[in-house]
Structures are given as structure tokens and as C-alpha cells.
Regions:
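Glycine-rich beta-alpha junction loops
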Residues: 12, 97-99, 170-175, 212-214, ...
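Aromatic-enriched alpha-helical interface/lid elements that frame and gate functional surfaces
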Residues: 204-264
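Conserved Rossmann-fold dehydrogenase catalytic segment
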Residues: 100, 127-135, 158-174, 193-200, ...
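N-terminal helix-loop segment corresponding to the beta1-alpha1 unit
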Residues: 1-162, 193
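Mid-domain beta-loop-alpha active-site segment that forms a flexible
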Residues: 136-151, 170-178, 220, 224
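Glutamine-centric residue-chemistry signal
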Residues: 115, 164-167, 218
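Residue-level detector of beta-strand structural context in well-folded domains
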Residues: 30-32, 166, 206
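Oxidoreductase and adenylate-handling cofactor-binding alpha/beta cores
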Residues: 143-164, 176-188, 229-236
Length: 264
């Protein structure tokens, strides 16, 4: 569907092509998932022939997407100024680890690094050991934000004919998911710690073991809590100060989880 997309890799193939190999030739599951309906080619953009191919592609393209640090883009002639000299209407979307300015601009990084630096790992698992989420949500969220920004840039180009630079970074994306915690800490000086699956700002919100497996219950807001107290036969909890609102229920979540566990 949609655009014609050409993925360009190094001559030997990029590393991500072979992560979690599932095919006879070693191609990885995520590579196959993310490259459906895409075209592909390999080249070396630092060689004359590779540069000629890149130039021809840029001349007829609307968008270039790259996940390389700024110095690397410049060394390959893929920086925005050079691309714009070839095609004034080009849109360059770059997704780096830490952005294109600042002390970390030239560093590379992975999903897990952003999870760690954003504080997300400190709020995952238990308080004894920071825990990384298995699913690379920062990678996927960064790509989604990049796609959103790119489409807005493309809509603007259709109106004005002008291209522009779109930038996302893994750390910015990860911080987007933890900003509420950082804001709370800055304003209220609240320093939260991981509490496994139990939420800290509402309840019941936790995982519970039943006779035939585990379930997750997530309750936010007074109406749902009232329904839960009716289910538990604990209507008197509605007048208990410990459970008067979401935050109070989160702070006393261990009591709510204990009651829910008994019911399960």
C-alpha cells in the first residue's frame, strides 16, 4: 500500500537483517515483518558508483529516511543540505539515538539504552533491579512518531513544494513515555520505585493468579472502583479515606490487591 519504499543496506547486508533468524538463508523475523512490500538494494555510498546511484534516487524521491548519526550522514553525503542541493523539495527524516545536537549527538544507541536513560527501567520489575521491557517499544514508538512527522512534512510539501527536516530520537521518544513521572518528581518531589505489576496511582490494577491462569485487572476512576467494590462485597470501602480517590487507592494498592487475590 502507499509509497514505493526502497531499503538501502550495506553490501553485506545490515545487522538487523539477521536478528532472530527464521528463514533458510538466515533472515530474521523482525526484518521480514518490517520489510513487507518494500524494495531493497545494497550499495556503498562512499564510493563514486554508490554516490551516483544515491543521487539518482534522491532526484526522483520525496523522502529520505536514515537512522545514522549526523557526522555519518555528512560523510556519506546524506545530510540535509547536500540532499536539498540535489532535490530542493526533499524531506529528510532522521531517527538517531540522542538527537543531532548536544554532547551525545555523535553517539549511537539501542532501544534498551533509551529505556534505561529515561527512567523506565527503574519503574519496571521490582525495586531491587532495573528491568528492561522485552518488547522494543522505544524503537517502534520512535518509528511511529517519525512516520507521523514525515506525513505532516509531506502534506506541507504538497501545499508549498518545500521540503524539510524531520527528526526523532530514541531518548526523546522514551522520555515521552515517562514524562509524567519526571514532572511529578520535579513538582512534588515524589520518587517512585518499581512495584512489579501493581499500579501506584489507581487500583485495583495488578496481576492475579486464578485457578486456570493469570489475569490482569486495571481499574481507573470512581465508577469502575464502585463496580469492583460491589463485586467484592466491600461497599463500605467507598467511604474509607484510604480508597477515596485513584491516588489513595494506588498508595494503598497492596490492600486492594490482597483482597482481589483472595477473591481470585
Amino acid at each position: 500500500y502507499g509509497a514505493e519504499v526502497i531499503r538501502i543496506e550495506r553490501i553485506s547486508g545490515s545487522e538487523d537483517r539477521y536478528v532472530t533468524p527464521v528463514s533458510e538463508d538466515g533472515q530474521g523475523a523482525m526484518f521480514l515483518q518490517l520489510n513487507r512490500n518494500k524494495l531493497g538494494l545494497t550499495l556503498n555510498p562512499t564510493k563514486d558508483k554508490g554516490q551516483d546511484i544515491v543521487k539518482k534516487l534522491v532526484e526522483r524521491s520525496d523522502i529520505v529516511i536514515a537512522n545514522l548519526p549526523e557526522p555519518t550522514l555528512k560523510s556519506m553525503g546524506l545530510d540535509y543540505e547536500n540532499l536539498r542541493s540535489i532535490n530542493p523539495g526533499i524531506i529528510l527524516t532522521s531517527n538517531t539515538a540522542f538527537g543531532t545536537t548536544g554532547p551525545y549527538a555523535e553517539r549511537v544507541g539501542f532501544d534498551g539504552v533509551a529505556q534505561a536513560m529515561s527512567g523506565a527501567m527503574d519503574m519496571t520489575g521490582d525495586s531491587e533491579q532495573p528491568t528492561k521491557a522485552y518488547a522494543p517499544y522505544v524503537d517502534f514508538c520512535s518509528a511511529s512518531l517519525a512516520a507521523f512527522g514525515t506525513m505532516l512534512a509531506f502534506l506541507e510539501k504538497q501545499k508549498t513544494g518545500k521540503g524539510q527536516r524531520v527528526q526523532t530520537s530514541l531518548l526523546q521518544t522514551a522520555l515521552t513515555t515517562t514524562n509524567s513521572l519526571l514532572i511529578e518528581q520535579e513538582i512534588l518531589n515524589v520518587n517512585r520505585f518499581a512495584s512489579m505489576n501493581r499500579a501506584q496511582t489507581s487500583g485495583p490494577s495488578d496481576t492475579f493468579q486464578t485457578k486456570d491462569g493469570w489475569i490482569l485487572v486495571q481499574t481507573v476512576g470512581q465508577p469502575l472502583f464502585e463496580r469492583w467494590t460491589n463485586l467484592m462485597g466491600e461497599e463500605d470501602w467507598l467511604s474509607d479515606e484510604k480508597f477515596k480517590d485513584d491516588l489513595s487507592r494506588g498508595e494503598n494498592g497492596h490492600l486492594i490487591s490482597e483482597r482481589m487475590s483472595q477473591w481470585c
